[in-house]
Structure formats: structure tokens, C-alpha cells
Amino acid sequence: MRGLGLTLAAACAAWLAWWAWPDGAHSEAAAARQAARGGFAPSLIGTRPDGAAAEADGKLVVDQQLRQLFDYYLATLGERDLAVIRTELQGQLKRSLKNGPLAQAMGLFDRYVGYKRSLAGKAAAAATDLSHRLELVQAARRQYFSQAELDGLFGDEDRYDNFTARRLAIEANPALSVDEKRRRVAQLEQQLPPGLRAAREEPVKHLALADAEARLRQGGGGEQQLYQLRAGMVGQAAADRLGELDREQAAWQNRVDDFKRERTAILADGGLSAQQRQQALARLQAQRFSQQESLRLPAYLSN
């Protein structure tokens, strides 16, 4: 699960993101020519496909992993024409699917594209209330997908969106007291599937941990107390990982501080010309940091 990124707001925002979807598609020959001119899409350089495709008992597995794969490629619309995107996706799917499931996947992709296009025509509904937006989105989905496909592609999102709409209705109800609103929202949360409930609680848990850590440090707490605090709030394994991250960050900061001192000495050397200073700084940075680390460096040097 990708957490609470699957939200009602995200579904509604899709209307505006897809309003400029091109009409029709280029021929396969045009798709091949465009792909040949510069690979697939610049924005995907250095990335791996998000999501995955799978089959079971000779049939396509329709789930959110497959939808994520569709969205990964469709995110390049604008950089690449739809025909190019479809051809590239088909090539990716051939690596994991046989002919039957592959045909199912491409048919599902075409309907997914149709669904996305249909949302563009409902952009005006963005001005209405969230519950109405949700109804429009779900009605559009029913026009393109079977119930089994809906459950696979959008199940968790629909459940969380319905929860969100009901929660907002409770919070907006002036007839309810603060305590009654809190009680009803808590009841709604208990109706969420365990995975969604845990995902909803996760950001709150980390915010609470960060606040507790800050109070502990302000009070003079040491590393052992910090570890005990973390283990009690997020578990021993997570506390171990956080401790390792702390050590890595401290080691990195020490390297940055050493670099700053040496850089200051170079800049203060009156015997060097401006060009010599720049060359010396470039050599120093190359000696101390890899190319990847150098990308992080400016943010720390500005402090």
C-alpha cells in the first residue's frame, strides 16, 4: 500500500490534470518514430517502473500495483504521445505476462485511459462539495470497470475516500458537540480496514515521536533515554533504524564541517588568484564527496 496518498483530493484533482488529454492517438509508426528520437521520456530517466503486473491461473491480476504501473507511464503524457506511451507499456508488460493476460491488461489500460478522459469533462464539478465529487468519480468508474476491477484498482482508495467524506460531514455538523464529533470520528476509524487504519495513524505517530524527542533533548536526555523513548513509541526495530540514521547523519555533518573549514582556508589564502581558488575548491570537493553526495552539499553549505 502506498499510504494515504490515495485520497479523495487526489481523485478530484485528476480532473484538472487530465483536461488537456489529446484527442485521438498517433499511428504505431508515429509512436515508433517518436520513441526512436530520444528514448522514452526524460522525466523517467534514473527511475524504475512504479507498480507491477502479474497473472494467476492464466488470468490478469487486477490490483493497485497494476494501476500504479499504468499511472507511471501515463505521467509522461505531454512529453510523449499516448500511442508512444501505450507501446512502451505493452513492451514492459510483455516481460511478465503471457498473451492472454497481456491482452487483458492492454484492454484494461485502454478503458483506464477512457475513464481518465471522462474525468476531464467533469472539471466543473471541482467547485462542488467533496461528497458530490466522490459520487461523480465513482459513477465514472462504474461506466468503465466491472465490480471486481473496481475492487482491485480502487478498493482501498474508495474505502478511504468514503471515510473522508463521512468524517468531513461529521466535523461540519453544527448540531454535534466537540466530544460527540470526536466519538463519531473514532467509530468511523475503527471501521477502516487494519491496513488503512495503520496508514492513517502512521503520520500522527511520527509527529508525536518527533515532538517527544524534542522535549527529551531540551530536557537534557541522553542517547539511551532517546532509544528507550523510540522503542516504546515505534518499536525496537524502528528505534534501531532511527539510531543508525542518526549516526549516518552525524558522520555526514562532520564531513561537511571539515569541508567548510578547509574551504574557508582556501578562500582566505591571499596568495591564490580567483581562478586558483576555484580550482582548489573543485579539487577539494571532488576529494571529499562523490558526485551523488555533491548534489546534497549546497543545502548544507548555505547554513
UniProtKB/Swiss-Prot annotation:
GO terms for cellular component: plasma membrane. InterPro entries: Lipase_chaperone. Its main location: membrane. The keyword Plastid does not apply. It comes from the Bacteria. It is a single-pass membrane protein. The chain crosses the membrane at residues 7-23. The keyword DNA-binding does not apply. SUPFAM superfamilies: Lipase chaperone-like. Keywords: Cell inner membrane, Cell membrane, Chaperone, Lipid degradation, Lipid metabolism, Membrane, Transmembrane, Transmembrane helix. One of its GO terms (biological process) is lipid catabolic process. One of its GO terms (molecular function) is unfolded protein binding. It is found in: Cell inner membrane. Belongs to the lipase chaperone family. May be involved in the folding of the extracellular lipase during its passage through the periplasm. HAMAP family: Lipase_chap (MF_00790). This is Lipase chaperone. It comes from Chromobacterium violaceum (strain ATCC 12472 / DSM 30191 / JCM 1249 / CCUG 213 / NBRC 12614 / NCIMB 9131 / NCTC 9757 / MK). The gene is lifO.
